[in-house]
């Protein structure tokens, strides 16, 4: 089992709009079979205005398939709508992948 963590450093004051996008995306992703996503905002972190998403996958192949974003045409249209303006909210980011040992 693997833990996928995306860490996004938002532009000042842009965490809330990005969080709303990701809440909707998490709901859509669950419908598309991605499983449950956790969303976290910083109380105290490496940088201010941080949003972290986490989800678990059984193997990296599953993650690669999820990353291809395949779904119904309606779902894909909705995902595209949700991602519009994403880059206007984010300054920088990174992805961490961990193997769950216990």
Positions of predicted regions on the chain:
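Absolute protein N-terminus
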Residues: 1-2, 102
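Residue-level preference for beta-strand/loop junctions
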Residues: 2, 47-49
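Active-site-flanking beta-strand signature of metal-NTP-handling nucleotidyl enzymes
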Residues: 3-8
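Short, surface-exposed ligand-recognition loops at beta-strand->loop->(often short) alpha-helix junctions
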Residues: 9-20
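An amphipathic, aromatic/His-enriched active-site/gating alpha helix that lines ligand/cofactor pockets
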Residues: 24-38, 54-94
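A short beta-turn/loop motif at secondary-structure boundaries
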Residues: 41-47, 86-87
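Long, low-complexity, Ser/Thr/Gly/Pro-rich intrinsically disordered segments that act as flexible linkers
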Residues: 96-101
